[in-house]
Amino acid sequence: MEYLDFEEPIKELEEQYSKACNIGEESEVDVTATCKQIEKKLKEKKKEIYKNLTPWQRVQLSRHPNRPYTLDYINAICGDTFLELHGDRNVKDDKAMIGGLGKIDDQSFMFVGQQKGYNTKTRQYRNFGMANPEGYRKALRLMKSAEKFGVPVVCFVDTPGAYPGLEAEERGQGEAIARNILEMTRLKVPIFVVIIGEGASGGALGIGVGDKVMMLENTWYSVISPESCSSILWRSWEYKERAAEALKLTATDMKKQKLIDEIVKEPLGGAHTNREEIFNTVKSSISNAYSEFKNLSQAELVEKRMGKYLDMGVFKG
């Protein structure tokens, strides 16, 4: 288990608890009362820390190396019904953007999302979750296929941004993202977006338009990362905490500004502390969202979605 800097008090108490339990197992000393006392302190400390997280600490949690990624959610939710589909039919198959068909109960869904790696090798293979233009074009191809067959779409967002390399720009990174945003606003099937980690810039927006946009409790969604914002405004990454506060990037901030529709509660300590619980919660959220939109006609669906986005950012005096 890896710990973030603000989780050090929890780490210390967990080590104390582990040592006390080991002493009890290896000797005849009764440490039951001590273990219970430490366990009580541990619960109180966890509540104290996680109920008062700063925006920057939530950013840190969203990047936790043990946090579940897109394929973890899809495999847990769909089981062996998931069939991955590949390629944009033009350039190549972008490994940073995955997608395919799967079932939740008896209902088929088209799943799309950015995928990160678990170690150095797989992180390079997945390009750290930063998709190229062909990744966004693959995502659009899958969404258009879903529209053709009347299958609802689920997008899992978890990216530090679209890949900013020269080759990506040469192949039309900006156009690919813009095209996705345009097409998603008028797609004639329900679209549900779940932000499961980082939601950075146009890289997130490229698969982020939906009838219902949900954010996990410890995720963020912003035009720029706190570090990049800090380096632009203050010429240093040292002010990233201040930048995170100013950007209003947390799920609570997004809900308050009506830029998302729902906050999905995470287990205490983050999604990685109880994977089964967060998988079941996300599955229920998707199923509930589908129940809400499944009876709308195609015209009503598109009109409602367009109306939602046209209302964003409108000043009312």
From Swiss-Prot:
MF-aspect GO terms: acetyl-CoA carboxylase activity; ATP binding; carboxyl- or carbamoyltransferase activity
Gene3D superfamilies (alphabetical): 2-enoyl-CoA Hydratase, Chain A, domain 1 (3.90.226.10)
Domain of life: Bacteria
Keyword Lipid biosynthesis: yes
Predominant localisation class: cytoplasm
Pathway: Lipid metabolism; malonyl-CoA biosynthesis; malonyl-CoA from acetyl-CoA: step 1/1
Localization in the cell: Cytoplasm
InterPro entries: Acetyl_CoA_COase_a_su, ClpP/crotonase-like_dom_sf, COA_CT_C
Function: Component of the acetyl coenzyme A carboxylase (ACC) complex. First, biotin carboxylase catalyzes the carboxylation of biotin on its carrier protein (BCCP) and then the CO(2) group is transferred by the carboxyltransferase to acetyl-CoA to form malonyl-CoA.
Protein name per the record: Acetyl-coenzyme A carboxylase carboxyl transferase subunit alpha
Biological source species: Christiangramia forsetii (strain DSM 17595 / CGMCC 1.15422 / KT0803) (Gramella forsetii)
Lineage: Bacteria, Pseudomonadati, Bacteroidota, Flavobacteriia, Flavobacteriales
